[in-house]
Swiss-Prot record:
Residues 70-91 are annotated as: Interaction with MTOR. GO terms for molecular function: sphingosine-1-phosphate phosphatase activity. This is Inactive phospholipid phosphatase 7. Keywords: Endoplasmic reticulum, Membrane, Nucleus, Phosphoprotein, Transmembrane, Transmembrane helix. Residues 134-141, 224-239 are extracellular. GO terms for cellular component: endoplasmic reticulum membrane; membrane; nuclear envelope. Plays a role as negative regulator of myoblast differentiation, in part through effects on MTOR signaling. Has no detectable enzymatic activity. Residues 1-66 are annotated as: Disordered. It is found in: Nucleus envelope; Endoplasmic reticulum membrane; Membrane. Its main location: nucleus.
Length: 271
């Protein structure tokens, strides 16, 4: 027994790894990975496989995700066209808004441009039509003025209803004036001044005998009213174009429901 112990001590002394400079090689590293046996134990019978329901749910999600990605990354042609037209509309409206603020390039002409827009406002037109109706002494004149008043009231209600429904803001942060609040012309789409100018100009061209220069000036006035609303930053270009279309449609509607002279006289006498 003592002989075997002495032989074991001799082997330990002759072992190179038992020297002081190699003792660190025999010690396991701190914070190192666990031995493989622990990994085999973790993957043993005690580990439970995921339930079958989760796997089916993940497969369904993986099948749905590529379709959603394709829908987002490949929009339809209508969506691309609509977004492109909207971007062009905003860019043109920003460029044409040269009187939108005090720091704009045409800020000195803002008052004159706003004055042109006021000529297409509903309050002056309704007030002027009522005044002319009171002063008129002919049945034909009263008939035309009563139908014009009907067209103006129809325009205000139509524009206010569509603006309240869509609620589109203008290209610049401009607050509506007091006259705009009175006629409920608060939002941008459609442009109420443009629809009114188009409707009134078409009405006058159809029911008044005017010389050719006056007809040309009437059309130019309607175009200038619409352009002035874009220049002060109140409306987009598409708002004004839509206003022109709505004004023409309103004129056609008034022509369909035109009140005869007898109806106009009855309304005037009741008033």
């Amino acid at each position: 027994m003592p002989a075997s112990q002495s032989r074991a001590r001799a082997r330990d002394r002759n072992n190179v790894l038992n020297r002081a400079e190699f003792l660190s090689l025999n010690q396991p590293p701190k914070g190192g990975p666990e031995p493989r046996s622990s990994g085999r134990k973790a993957s043993g019978p005690s580990a439970q496989p995921p339930p079958a329901g989760d796997g089916a749910r993940e497969r369904r999600q993986s099948q749905q995700l590529p379709e959603e990605d394709c829908m987002q990354l490949n929009p339809s042609f209508k969506g691309i066209a609509f977004n492109s037209l909207l971007a062009i509309d905003i860019c043109m409206s920003k460029r044409l808004g040269v009187c939108a603020g005090r720091a704009a390039s045409w800020a000195s002409a803002r008052s004159m441009v706003k004055l042109i827009g006021i000529t297409g406002h509903g309050i002056p037109w309704i007030g002027g039509t009522i005044l002319c109706l009171v002063k008129s002494s002919t049945l034909a004149g009263q008939e035309v003025l009563m139908n014009l008043l009907l067209a103006l009231l129809l325009d205000i209600m139509t524009v206010a209803g569509v603006q309240k429904l869509i609620k589109r803001r203008g290209p610049y942060e401009t607050s509506p004036s007091l006259l705009d609040y009175l006629t409920m012309d608060i939002y941008a789409f459609p442009a109420g001044h443009a629809s009114r100018a188009a409707m009134v100009s078409k009405f006058f061209l159809s029911h008044l005998v005017l010389a050719v220069p006056l007809r040309v000036l009437l059309v130019l006035w309607a175009l200038c009213v619409g352009l002035s609303r874009v220049m002060i930053g109140r409306h987009h270009v598409t708002d004004v174009l839509s206003g022109f279309v709505i004004g023409y449609l309103q004129f056609r509607l008034v022509e369909l429901v035109w009140m005869p002279s007898s109806t106009c006289q009855m309304l005037i006498s009741a008033w």
